[in-house]
Amino acid sequence: MEISGTSNRILEVNLTQRDVKEIQVHEKDRKMYLGAKGLGLKLLYDRLAPGIDPLGEDNYLAFMMGVFMGTGAPCSGRFAAVTKSPLTGIMLSSSCGGPFGMALKTAGFDGLLVTGRSENPVSLMIDDQGVNFEDASGIWGMDAEKAQETLQNDKTCGILIIGPAGENRVPIANIRSGDRFLGRGGMGAVMGSKNLKAIVAKGGAFTIVPKNPERFDKVKKKATAYMNRNSPTVEYRKFGTSSNVDWCNSGGIIPVNNFRGGSHEAAQKVSGKAMQKRYQTRHHTCKPCTILCGHKGTLADGSVHSVPEYETVGLLGPNLGIYDPDQIVEWNDLCGRMGMDTISTGAVLGWVMEAGEKGLLNTSLSFGSPEGVTEAISHMANGTGFGQEMARGTRWLSEKYGGREFAVQVKGLEMAAYDPRGSWGQGLSYAVANRGACHLSAYPTGLEVLFGLLNPYTTRAKPRFVYFFENLYAAINSLQTCQFTSYAYVLEPPIVKYTPKFMLGLTMQYLPAVAIMLMDVSIFSKLFSAVTGIRMNQWEMLKAGSRVHTLERLMNTREGIRRKDDTLPERFLKEGRSCDDAHHTVPLYEMLDDYYKLRGYDHQGIPSAGTLRKLGIEIKDPGVSFKGNEDFRFMVPRGKCVKRLYISVMLWFVGRAMQAAAKVDKGVKKEFEAIPKGFRFSLGVSPGGPAMVMEKTAAGRVKYVGSKPKGKPMDLQIKIKHLEGAILLFTFQESTAIAVARDRLVVEGDVPRACTVVRILDMVEVLLLPKIIAGLAVKRYPTWSPLRKHLGRCMVYVRAILGF
């Protein structure tokens, strides 16, 4: 039988009630969210209440096919999964190239939603007739590879399976399909929490035919030609994604010893070329695929194994000080059988090794030694011994034992194998990515390091390209196809391909919006239109990608995600790499505001009501109030001279307000009583920037002296390290306490008095600002009486303006 375009049928299974029903996808939702990831998020947005337990029976697990699946579109053998992560506590989306997607699609279904919890271990058997529930107690406890072999009795079958890590609800457990994985964020733990060992789909009952076959074939031919001549995709075909080792090592961004270094002379031993020669590799990849990046190889003992992907090589190799490819292959294979994410596993092992060096833990694990690693991985998967704690991730470990500054994670998800200190755009992308430190949300490091088109050590143009690639990749993961196709589709069209590299680079760096206009991503939208019959151009497709990305962010804000979470580990903000004489760090906060503006977020990183309306996203109690504040965001000064002038005026006014508050507010008076007479302190921008000088006179009065000390020595100087930090502070996007915690301030002189001054500044901000702003600017908003607040505010303003 044939399906023209797509079936638009989705199964919804409740394991608690053993109930199955069918959902129809409407054309409006198809056009707005495309499919796969986008539709999965929309379905969960309509069903998930904020704050649910990711491992509770109310969580949903969505497996979603895109419209390209089954059509023969290049690299279209991928599907998406969406749930709430037990590792991060926020939304989790993932992509996989295993055989399950094709099997479910050709069984006649575009997706599967699973909720509830089975009383006993169960497997789902799906064919064109529907769903059967089968007892899985016989395979419960088997590793993922063996259990999959037990169930695989037909070439038309596609299987999703968990290993011991998933059964034990380990927060970094993955789900396997063939030799591919839904790898990150603990999706396998969610499946295990439902006592669901496997899902088996028997396909082949249907074939998928595009609505416009002639147009489809024409676009497909063009897409294939682009990929066959694109240098990165050709490299991946020859050597796999571990060919990245060479350019990441030369670019100084490969993780070495828990991201302390960015390159190592021995890294070439684990490169794609070295492993191709060592293992005589052959293609073993997703179907259908034009790129053919997956490989298998034969070890010296004759055994055949999957050759590890770059991320696995980076995190289980140089990140641990290991340069033995056989060892990395062994650990990759073990993680695959146990059902555990190799990226998080490598990052956790790296953190434990460094924590041991620093005396935070007593461990035998150490950099450069494979001893104990195999046992540690097994303990993590089985939830035994210290492995039970390791499996909870680096964020949890560092909160318990210390060492947060070298816990290489964002929002709880461990970082992929690209050091952002050598790729500042990638640093911004990691910080703002919806699922955590993910390289698949946007990939500016390709332009910065692989192609050399953008200067990696500048903030210029980076927010624009992160925004563009986030929209593009959200669309790609909703259509769905492989993200590697974007290399070819973006850079192979003639207008880009034949522009001299230096001119293309200058355009990207200084006119990024123009450069993006030149990048032809219409192949994706043309394939979508040919398959579905729904007319769509590339700009509508990118808007759909923006809608998908923004919806995911909105769902995260319901779980409490805010600006404070869009950050990087201190290692990347304060420490240089051992391979970098210039000791570059990531100037993240210089890029964040521009990024928020492009996305239509407010100062706290919440999508504004206007943005949601523009994208057609319905507000379903997102956890914040938009009433009377629909598009509220601070006006941030732009341009260095304007910023200096703004800070000068603000310091002048705050100084006079502090002088006034010391006369009218009892709390401020009390704090100043602890400061001795004749004490002078200043708050200013370093080096040589605007400042305010305050003094408690011999008569006990608090006096604003001006912007310069006028000869008398200072007892205390509080210096803001740079102008951008001052802008964050004085546009009230960051409290003084947070600025101190983030090391934006330098204190010289009477350090104990600095705490008193910070408390006084907080009180003055409460007196000066309305609650909605002051609540962001101070560490803790006080419960003052209305009389004290409102009368005090009036008196402070009058005295500050008049200067008495």
Give each language-model segment a name.
Residues 96, 143, 215, 219, ...:
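Short amphipathic alpha-helical segments
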Residues 99-100, 147, 186, 327-334, ...:
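Short, hydrophobic/aromatic alpha-helical segments in well-folded domains
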Residues 1-233, 246-263:
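Protein-protein interaction/assembly regions in multi-subunit complexes
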Residues 92-96, 182, 190, 323, ...:
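Short alpha-helix boundary/capping segments
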Residues 47-50, 107, 158, 167-168, ...:
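A short, charged
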Residues 77, 152-185, 191-627:
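Extended C-terminal regions of large enzymes
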Residues 626-804:
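Feature captures hydrophobic
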Residues 25-63, 271-295, 681-700, 794-802:
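N-terminal-biased segments
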